[in-house]
A protein has these predicted regions:
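All-alpha prenyltransferase/terpene-synthase fold signal
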Residues: 1-304
Length: 304
């Protein structure tokens, strides 16, 4: 726990010592621990990435003409999925907008989740582990800026929003890179595609969050564009355009793939589903007739 504390450098993610024994006792019950794990796994990122990682890994193995053992493949993929699992409770702890009654449990679980992820990823070798550590460091920076803007809304600006999105692109981009064991050219191509696809999904998640919470998330692209334009409806429209820009950058990665790469059609289908995911939540937002309410709330908050 102390190692995790010094590494994360964020007191908000650390369990208060006075709660430690109670949380340990609670999580020692298998049914409680299983429930918390299931809640973490109930994540759009986790659901969307597992088949993608398998496709990238198999595509890279075929391209490099390698026979990779099933155990090693599972370790690399599972390790990165577990790392994404870790980003979920960390985000929930910072945002405090989901699973509020379970956040102390997540704080105790986080160091163990990270340890398991590292152990599995390290089986890919030093280069793979180094890429993961660099990506994890970037993701922590993104979460720090996210928290800074959440607690100090006056710090919301374009530059900070770009850095904040490291929490999406760093974890997913690194995972993509390591599906090719951090080797050129596929490692760089996978990194670009997964990083930008993750940022695109991030826009969709912010729209979904607005629907679930019945308020614009702080920080988020919809809030940033609302602050600039003073028009909430326009802000969500621009957020959709921002997501399309991210997706176009992700599509560049598909066009960069070598001709002999066999999984290109699957990746094209993946990006189509990402686009549909965002469009679905935007359509739900418009149908839900919440934008006028959001505008009223925004106007009141700006006048304060």
């Amino acid at each position: 726990m102390k190692k995790f504390t010094s590494e994360i450098g964020s007191s908000e993610l650390i369990l208060d010592d006075t709660k430690l024994n109670d949380v340990k006792t609670r999580l020692s019950r298998p049914e409680i621990l299983a429930d918390r794990i299931q809640r973490i796994l109930n994540s759009n990122f986790v659901k969307m990435t597992f088949p993608v990682f398998n496709a990238l890994f198999d595509g890279a193995s075929t391209y490099y003409k390698e026979e990779i053992s099933k155990d090693l493949k599972n370790s690399i993929i599972d390790g990165h999925v577990i790392a994404i699992d870790l980003s979920e409770p960390m985000d929930r702890i910072i945002d405090e907008d989901e699973d509020a009654e379970y956040l102390d449990d997540y704080k105790l679980m986080n160091p163990y989740i990270l340890e398991i992820a590292r152990e599995k990823i390290s089986q890919g070798g030093d280069s793979v582990l180094k890429a993961f550590e660099e990506g994890f460091k970037d993701a922590r920076l993104g979460q720090y800026i996210d928290y800074k803007m959440k607690t100090r809304p006056e710090s919301i600006n374009y530059e900070n929003m770009i850095i904040c999105y490291k929490k999406y692109r760093a974890v997913m981009g690194t995972a993509g890179r390591n599906m090719a064991f951090n080797r050129a050219p596929l490692g760089d191509i996978f990194h670009l595609g997964m990083a930008k696809a993750a940022e695109c999904v991030g826009c969709g998640n912010e729209i979904q969050d607005a629907l679930k919470q019945r308020s614009i998330k702080t920080p988020s692209w919809p809030l940033y564009y609302s602050l600039i334009s003073k028009d909430v409806r326009k802000a969500f429209e621009i957020t959709m355009k921002k997501s399309e820009i991210y997706l176009k950058e992700a599509d560049l990665a598909v066009h960069m793939l070598p001709l002999e790469f066999q999984f290109k059609p699957f990746l094209e289908f993946l990006f189509l589903t990402v686009n549909h995911y965002n469009q679905y939540w935007y359509n739900e937002l418009v149908r839900g007739d919440m934008l006028d309410s959001f505008q009223k709330d925004f106007n009141i908050s700006v006048r304060r």
